[in-house]
Amino acid sequence: MRISLFLTFVFQLVLAQDRIFEVHPYGRLGTDKNLTASTSLGDLDGDGDMDIVVANGRHWSEKNRVFFNDGKGFFRRSISLGAERNTTYVTLMVDIDNDGDLDVLVGNDRIRNQVFKNDGSGNLVFDHYFGFQTSNTRGLCTADLNGDGFVDVAVANRQGQNYIYFNNGKGNYADAQPFGGPKEATITIAAADMDGDGSMDLVLANRDGQPNYIYFGSKFVKKITYGTGSDESRDVDVGDMDGDGQLDIVVANIGDRNMIYYGSKKGSYDRSKAFGNPAAATHSIMLADLDRNGNIDIVVGNKGQRNHYYLNNKKELMKYTFGQKDGDTYGVTIGDLDGDVYPDIVTANSGGWNIIYYNRTPK
């Protein structure tokens, strides 16, 4: 979207009777030339508000950027993340060395993945590489996967071997364990205790017509499938969508409708609900309670189509549209950027401005 459009009007989207989404002239990140794949949110400089790391490049080398929140939800100051240009698909903010501040992990396409450690003030210094030069990393997922109190990383490598990198207790990822098949076309991994045994499990979204899997911790050998067995999935998130106490799986698909697979006490995911367009081009999906009514809602980012969010009342999903008509949204992230307790949406748009949609009270 051109900057002139931002300067001439504020586009408001009806979220519910008492909420709106609002685009502000200052609520954009990067340039309209960046090939942004995703964003991540967290308080990097310890000032109490959420900052944003933007993952740029995809297959082409660009610099990743860190945008610092001014306390009001605007991002006028930014720095490069490292000196290099990289082919980055994903960044994550997480405290990997248990020192109380957020560090940054970077997942790259056919370049080794990177770790940047934080000095507590938002100064991010390259620490070490992990992974392989030839890996097509598309997703990173962090959780304590072996129960030692430190954050590990599961890496989704499209058309290659997926790996878990275990934290050595000092924020280093040298110990690698492969899991799954040698040629899984994994794009995204979500971590959750799907079977309630106290260990984290890994939920995969695979493309290229491959089955989607759940790998059960702590060994990550036992697995089950969910979905049709031949989906073109791009993203996955996990939450209790119907309030029955069981975790459900929400998956984004290309060329088909997006799906919710409801968990049962038996550990199966046979009951499902389709939502979205029959020929969806959804690349990103994220769950959050947008209207703070106690139910988990869904935000989807589409390529070449308008984006949507779905408000959940446990019986049905109410669909709303937002974003550009022909934008290429590769990522959506959700968090309270302006400190009003309502979650805002950040869209990562390849070849366009990255846009913040503020969740506001109507005037």
Model-identified regions with their sequence ranges:
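Hydrophobic beta-strand segments that make up the repeating blades of beta-propeller
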Residues: 52-57, 104-108, 153-156, 202-206, ...
